[in-house]
């Protein structure tokens, strides 16, 4: 799948469009086919790693999650075995890690 990938902290120059593996679905997770993702201040903070204290949660030397983006809207493609409230085909929006990709 296509995704925006970030291997290090910095400005927009650290972002790279690449093909990566589609995320695996955990037992209590949902796979979303992304139709839209927004960019906001929180994404900028996570991308730049500033203030430095944030890196204790997001990765000291480089981001733990290489695909940025948190706000997402799309269609449910798959569900884990413990998911009860959603079904494939449902349209959803919300917060997740890795929204800047074809699947999150």
Please identify what each model-predicted range represents.
Residues 44-54:
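Short Gly/aromatic-enriched secondary-structure transition segments
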Residues 99-104:
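Short, Lys/Arg- and Gly-enriched loop/turn segments at beta-strand edges
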Residues 10-15, 41-42:
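Short N-terminal binding/cap micro-motifs at the start of the first secondary-structure element
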Residues 1-4:
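Short structural boundary motif marking the start of a folded domain
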Residues 21-39, 52-98:
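Glycine-rich beta-strand-centered segment in the early N-terminal region that forms part
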Residues 6, 47, 77-78:
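Short beta-strand-to-turn element immediately C-terminal to the catalytic PLP-Schiff-base lysine
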Residues 6-8, 95:
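A generic structural motif
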Residues 15-16, 62:
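A short, acidic/glycine-rich surface segment
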């Amino acid at each position: 799948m296509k995704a925006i990938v970030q291997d290090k902290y910095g400005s927009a120059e650290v972002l790279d469009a690449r093909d990566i593996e589609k995320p695996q679905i955990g037992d209590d997770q949902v796979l979303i086919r992304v139709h839209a993702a927004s960019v906001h201040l929180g994404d900028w903070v996570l991308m730049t790693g500033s203030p430095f204290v944030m890196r204790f949660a997001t990765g000291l030397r480089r981001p733990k999650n290489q695909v940025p983006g948190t706000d997402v809207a799309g269609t449910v493609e798959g569900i884990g075995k413990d998911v009860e409230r959603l079904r494939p085909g449902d349209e959803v929006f919300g917060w997740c890690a890795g929204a800047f990709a074809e699947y999150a």
